[in-house]
Each structure stands twice: as C-alpha cells, then as structure tokens.
C-alpha cells in the first residue's frame, strides 16, 4: 500500500469525532459530522504525522472555545486569556472561518453581538458573561463582509440579514457622528485598544482605552490625538461596500452606502497613504504622519483596498521582503528593520512578533489579487512550526515559529484548520465554488513533512476525498476516483461541480495532466499563480499575474 492509499484508508476508517473527543450528539459535533469533515496524514515510516495530531487537537480545542454567553446559546469565544467574543476578531474573521465547520455558532455569534448593541447605535467591542463592553471600538475585519459571506453560505436567511444590516447601519451612523471629529471623512483612533494594537510603538504615549471609558471621547491632553487611522478607515470602506450589497439584496437603495464608501476611500488615500513608501500611516491631529511601519499595511489590503499594481508594490517592497515583514514564521506585526521592532513573543504584543490574527486575516488580501503562491510560501514556516507545537498560541517567534503567549486561542486554532483546507483540502466558497487544493505538506522541514495526507468534506450533498503525496493528488467523489493532478495545483469547481479552473499554488512551475474520469487528459504547464480556465475539458486560456519571490 503506497502512502496515498494508506492516508485514504485511514481517512475512511477513522472517526473524526472519536479522535477529538467531541460527542456526536453535541450541536457542534452534529455539524462537523454532517459536513463529512476529516483529515489524516502519515509519515514515510507509516506513523501518524504531527499535522494530523495537531488538526485533531485544533477541533477539540475549538470546541472548548464554543460556550454560551447569557441567553445567546453557543457562541465562539476568543480563547486563552481573552474572555467572550470580540468584534475585531472572534465575531468577524474567526466566525467567518468557523462558518465552514459550525455555521450555527457563527450565526449565533453575530446575532449576540447585534443584541448587545447600545441604544445610541454603538456595537460592543466584546460581549462576555458580564455583558457588552463599550470602552473602545476595536475594529479590524469588516463585520458586514463576514455577515454577507455567512448569508450566502447558509441558505440566504433574510431575517438574519435584516437584523444584522440594521445593527451595522446604526453602528456606522455612530461612527460617523463620533469618530470623524476633524471632518476628514476617515475614522479616528482615540486609544490603543481601538485597533487592538497592544504594545505597538504605533501608540506609544497614547492611552490604552478611550478617555474616561467613553468611546466617544479622547484625552485632549495627549498630543496628536485623534489619529485618522488607516485600518479603521479601510474597515469602514469595506463595511459600507458590503452594506451596499446587503441593501440591494434586501430591496433597499445601495447608492448611499456606495457614496459613503467612496468618501472614506478618498480620505484613506488623502490622509493615510504615503505614495513614496507605499505604507499607510496614522495622521496625527497636527497633520504629521505617525511613521511606524506596522501590519496596518496588511490590514488595509485585507479590506479590499487597492488595485493589483498597489498590491504588487506592497509585495515587492514590504510583504515578501525579509528585511521588512516576511519572517521565518510569517508576517511580523512591526517591520523587522524598524528600530522599534521587538520580537518578544512571550507576551501579548503587536510590537514585532508574528500574531495568529495577522495570519488568519492575510488570505483576503492575497487571494483578491490572485497571489496564492506567495501566501502559501509565506505561511509554510508557521505551518511547519505548528505541527510540532503543544498549544495554540497568540504570538509566535519570528525566527523559529515557537509558540508564545497564551493557549487555546481560537484565531490560531482556526488558522491551522483554514490553512490545511486552503493548501491541501476541500474548501467550499460562498459563491458556490469548491477549491480542491493539492499543495500537500510533504516538503516541511524539522521532521514535519508528511508522506501523504488526505482530507474529506461533503459539499452540496457530494462527498469529496482528496489524498496526495509529494507527486500527485487524487480526488474521489462519492467514493469513486474522479480527478487526478500533480502536487502544487488547485482545481476550482464551479457551482455545478465541474472543473472550471486550475491554479498553481506552488512557488515554482508545475507541469502535468489534469485527468478527469471519462475525459481525455489535459496537459498543462503553470507558473506560480497562473490560472488556466477549462471549458468542456479543453483549455480556454491562461492568465498569469506573475509571482514575487522573497526579497532581501
């Protein structure tokens, strides 16, 4: 039995819930089982690979992060030392990824946040057993995008969409009334925690919380406040653009949202963008930029900001540059060549270490511009490190990937689950596409390479199994071999389940045949990021956006 056959056999005979200790009658267990989710990986000598053990640990600890809050039922908690669900992460990017595993919990988390809204329209920055909290706004990932994604994935529940749309519209009105005191059209930061950038030199000398615990006030005795904040402003741009989509879906007029999004976008580039460096900086009240090179750049790009040219420049000058943000374990929170960089990963810090949230948010930026090979290359070091970890931490050592601050941290847990589906698994998309990704983790270092891995998921009533080694990938559909292609490709199925495109995820060219049962093989040679469109089993064209290798 070769390694692929062994991994596939383990996948078929294994029990995901038994391996994770989740009760099949548990609500989360029921959703995982109904989705047919599984993952197995074997080493060259037939042992269970570290990645398989960590995958099962991730599901088990994810369940620990799902608990009731008040009358809201089961909701996602941030985990570790962070109690409750947080707007910047748990209820947004965390809940978005969770929606592929436990969609009912995603819905409940969103609705719990909306239920905690204050009478004046402000959404809580977190909800805990003690109730909603309002001492800062703490926004990063746009909630409206996550709501829209969940709506499309789960049967288009218009009551859910209307509830969330009304809550988000009221929150937007609160922000417009209280967080644009300078009339720029942007969104202002009044304190460190508004952006969740704890310990970042971006906010040296700035209070952690808003003045006297009031999110509508800043301390007038602090020079420079308020800052026009690029990440907060970018959040609102994307938020309003998605509120326009939601308005159109609900029969409302989307144009006011589009106009307000355009005004915020103009403010972002007028006040926060430095065209010479390509970075985005806070603009202090005296007009000076706060020149701290931080992951604000990636936060902005992950909010659907910028065209392909701007993103390529960001890759070349910053994100894929080893003197800037590309470390051995992923993207740092402060540029490595900034003299204020501090890589201490043993504390809650955005002053340098790699943060799980940065890595979890990154795919939105890269995939919007077709730069999937750079994304896979950038996170390979953390995947390798995490295969040997004993806990799911918030912060990681940029040099080694060692786990640092806290444990049972849901963003790290969800990052591993997301990355293995994104690289070497079956990932259903909100628009109906299914990604079958074959970048099998067979080339990891530190003894963590697998001989083969196998993943399973049921999508639209069809059960897919994807198994591969260092050479090839086999995809079974409802138990029968259906597709075969070389390691390093992603085959994209359209909403009808037919192969529509092939994308190269690998950092080098990959040539081979796309073999579909009952059809003639299609020979392809693809450079990194190249996308071949397939129609009726024939090549319809290839688009090649280019590739940016690591720079120094």
Question: What do the predicted segments below correspond to?
Answer:
Residues 43-52, 97-110, 151-169, 183-184, ...:
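Structural helix-adjacent loops and short alpha-helical linkers that scaffold large soluble proteins
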């Amino acid at each position: 039995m070769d390694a692929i056959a062994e991994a596939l056999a383990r996948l078929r005979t294994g029990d995901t819930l038994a391996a994770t200790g989740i009760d099949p009658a548990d609500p989360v267990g029921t959703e995982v089982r109904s989705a047919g989710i599984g993952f197995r990986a074997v080493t060259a000598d037939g042992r269970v690979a570290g990645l398989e053990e960590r995958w099962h640990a991730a599901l088990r600890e994810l369940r620990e992060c799902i608990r009731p809050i008040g009358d809201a039922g089961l909701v996602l908690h941030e985990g570790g030392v962070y109690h409750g669900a947080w707007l910047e992460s748990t209820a947004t990017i965390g809940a978005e990824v969770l929606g592929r595993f436990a969609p009912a919990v995603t819905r409940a988390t969103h609705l719990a946040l909306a239920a905690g809204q204050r009478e004046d329209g402000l959404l809580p920055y977190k909800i805990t057993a003690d109730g909603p909290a309002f001492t800062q706004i703490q926004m990063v990932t746009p909630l409206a995008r996550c709501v829209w994604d969940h709506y499309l994935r789960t049967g288009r529940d218009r009551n859910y969409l209307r509830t969330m749309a009304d809550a988000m519209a009221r929150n937007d009105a609160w922000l417009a009334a209280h967080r644009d005191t300078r009339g720029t059209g942007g969104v202002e930061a009044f304190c460190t925690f508004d952006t969740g950038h704890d310990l970042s030199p971006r906010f040296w000398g700035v209070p952690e919380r808003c003045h006297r615990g009031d999110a509508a006030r800043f301390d007038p005795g602090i020079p420079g406040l308020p800052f026009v904040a690029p990440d907060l402003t970018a959040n609102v741009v994307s938020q309003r653009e998605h509120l326009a989509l939601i308005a159109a879906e609900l029969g409302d007029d989307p144009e006011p949202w589009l106009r307000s999004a355009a005004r915020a976008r103009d403010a972002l580039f007028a006040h926060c963008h430095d065209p010479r460096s390509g970075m985005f900086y806070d603009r202090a009240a005296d007009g000076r930029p706060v020149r701290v090179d931080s992951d604000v750049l990636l936060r902005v790009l992950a909010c659907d900001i910028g065209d392909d040219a701007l993103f390529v420049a960001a890759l070349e000058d910053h994100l894929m540059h080893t003197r800037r943000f590309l470390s051995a374990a992923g993207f740092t929170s402060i540029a490595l060549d900034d003299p204020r960089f501090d890589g201490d990963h043993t504390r809650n810090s955005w002053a340098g270490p790699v943060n799980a949230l940065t890595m979890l948010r990154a795919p939105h930026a890269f995939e919007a511009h077709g730069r999937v090979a750079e994304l896979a290359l950038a996170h390979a070091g953390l995947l390798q490190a995490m295969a040997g970890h004993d806990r799911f931490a918030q912060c990681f050592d940029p040099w080694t990937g060692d786990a640092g601050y806290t444990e049972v941290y849901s963003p790290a847990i969800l990052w591993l689950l997301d990355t293995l589906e994104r690289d070497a698994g079956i990932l259903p998309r909100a628009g109906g596409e299914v990604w079958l990704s074959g970048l099998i983790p067979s080339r990891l270092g530190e003894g963590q390479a697998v001989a083969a891995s196998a993943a399973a998921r049921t999508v639209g009533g069809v059960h897919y199994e994807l198994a591969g080694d260092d050479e090839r990938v086999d995809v079974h559909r409802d138990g029968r071999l259906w597709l075969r292609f070389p390691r390093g490709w992603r085959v994209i199925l359209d909403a009808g389940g037919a192969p529509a495109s092939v994308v190269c995820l690998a950092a080098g060219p990959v040539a081979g045949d796309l073999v579909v049962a009952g059809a003639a093989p299609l020979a392809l040679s693809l450079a990194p990021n190249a996308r071949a469109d397939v129609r009726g089993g024939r090549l319809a064209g290839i688009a090649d956006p280019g590739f940016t290798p690591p720079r120094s």
